[in-house]
């Protein structure tokens, strides 16, 4: 009797089992979201480093209703020749800290509280501060994210908040 060869379809691969945290490496130089609705090319960082950076961004500014693609766009700016060494070294330190607590690496640390613990231990480091401060503008300046928070954008060009309804927000 011939044994049936086990196969893995593209759909099965993309639907989940290969994910690392919120993002996973799909090939040399590429990172994709666990939903496979987005992917990004990396040129100066390792794809695994970018996947970990995306998870780190999500842990620093957690929003369940914000998709991974926005976090990926927020950290894409670190994929430069000038910052590659600092990012690779910082992520290696993050992974080492996770391994010191018994996890395979930071991105594969299953519980958010364990990842946040690791981040709290390094929150005063220049690496953490660089990522955290860059995320403030990298994440929240994306116009596509604004509606997710109920922000309608600036009002000056439309007559200001007084003429536009300065008290129409429903999230406070």
Task: Identify the function of each model-found stretch.
Residues 2-24:
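N-terminal secretory signal peptides and thylakoid transit peptides that target proteins
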Residues 7-8, 25-61:
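C-terminal segment of N-terminal export signals and the immediately downstream linker at the start
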Residues 18, 22-25, 61, 123, ...:
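Hydrophobic/aromatic-lined pockets within catalytic cores
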Residues 52-55, 69-172:
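Mature-region segments of soluble proteins
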Residues 9, 46, 67, 110-111:
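Helix N-cap and loop-to-helix transition residues
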């Amino acid at each position: 009797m011939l044994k049936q060869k086990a196969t893995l379809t593209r759909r099965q691969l993309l639907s989940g089992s290969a994910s690392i945290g919120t993002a996973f490496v799909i090939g040399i130089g590429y990172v994709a979201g666990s939903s496979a609705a987005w992917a990004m090319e990396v040129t100066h960082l390792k794809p695994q480093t970018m996947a970990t950076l995306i998870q780190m961004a999500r842990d620093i500014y957690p929003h369940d209703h914000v998709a991974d693609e926005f976090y990926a766009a927020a950290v894409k700016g670190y994929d430069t020749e000038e910052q590659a060494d600092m990012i690779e070294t910082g992520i290696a330190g993050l992974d080492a800290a996770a391994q010191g607590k018994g996890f395979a690496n930071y991105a594969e640390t299953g519980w958010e509280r364990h990842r946040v613990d690791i981040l709290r231990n390094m929150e005063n480091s220049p690496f953490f501060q660089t990522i955290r401060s860059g995320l403030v503008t990298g994440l929240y300046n994306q116009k596509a994210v604004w509606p997710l928070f109920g922000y309608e954008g600036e009002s000056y060009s439309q007559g200001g908040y007084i003429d536009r309804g300065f008290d129409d927000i429903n999230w406070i």
